[in-house]
Regions:
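Short, contiguous acidic/charged loop-to-helix segments that flank catalytic cores in large enzymes
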Residues: 107-112, 166-171, 201, 205
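Active-site neighborhood of phospho(di)ester-bond hydrolases with catalytic His/Asp-centered motifs
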Residues: 163-164, 194-196
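A conserved C-terminal secondary-structure "cap"
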Residues: 218, 224-225
Length: 225
């Protein structure tokens, strides 16, 4: 994601490191695309099958460069048989004091509004009408947007799936709400299931937590006839 935000304070440093690691000179967007392809080839050779994007929002207009790069990456993922995950909705680093004291990704993030729903549909439609959709999994952080994401996934099924309850929603109430949304607007059989942050070994129990909630819900439905 750092390569999709040229306005980010650390963008120049990140681009320099990408150029160094790939051996590709990055002087324009074509150079950036080439470097990203080289990096993708490396990850694919190491067995990578999933890519993940965490974005505050998805909209057109001022974000045309980012959209162009996302569309390009989506096509590359499809060509390589990789899954494209879109985690949408957080607003980052809200407290200047906390950011200055402990840095990024340290508790200063909050729930935001993802996007104009039409922008999300427009993005997926562009991918579909271009080279074709890769497999896409959508995750919303704002629970008020669950119906937007679940119905959008149905629009582009089976390539697009509605992902598991994420972050602040990864709770008893949040997981139940996500499952209800999935069953009401789509099919439970189309669930992508639970996922785990591989960087955090303490997150692995969430699979058991999810399984118990899912089994309790199914048992209640069966018991109720």
């Amino acid at each position: 994601d750092r390569y999709l935000e040229p306005e980010h304070p650390g963008a120049r440093k990140h681009l320099s490191r990408l150029a160094e690691s790939t051996g590709v000179a990055i002087a324009d967007i074509d150079g950036l695309k080439h470097a990203l392809c080289v990096a993708l080839d490396h990850f694919q050779a190491c067995g990578c099958v999933v890519a993940d994007h965490g974005l505050s929002c998805l909209r057109g207009g001022a974000d045309e460069v980012r959209e162009q790069l996302l569309l390009f990456l989506g096509e590359e993922y499809r060509r390589r048989g990789m899954v494209m995950q879109l985690h949408l909705g957080p607003i980052r680093d809200q407290s200047p004091r906390l950011l200055e004291t402990v840095g990024h990704d340290a508790g200063g993030d909050s729930v935001g509004a993802t996007s104009d729903p039409a922008a999300l549909g427009h993005f997926l439609a562009k991918l579909e009408s271009g080279g074709g959709l890769p497999r896409v999994i959508l995750y919303n952080l704002n629970p008020a947007e669950s119906a937007v994401f679940s119905t959008m996934a149905v629009n582009f099924a089976p390539q697009v799936q509605y992902g598991a309850a994420w972050w602040f929603n990864d709770t008893l109430r949040g997981i139940n709400a996500q499952l209800d949304e999935l069953m009401e607007t789509g099919l439970l059989a189309h669930s992508a299931g639970m996922l785990t942050d591989s960087r955090s070994f303490t997150s692995f129990p969430r699979h058991e937590y999810y399984r118990r909630i899912l089994c309790a819900k199914l048992g209640k439905l069966v018991d109720g006839g």
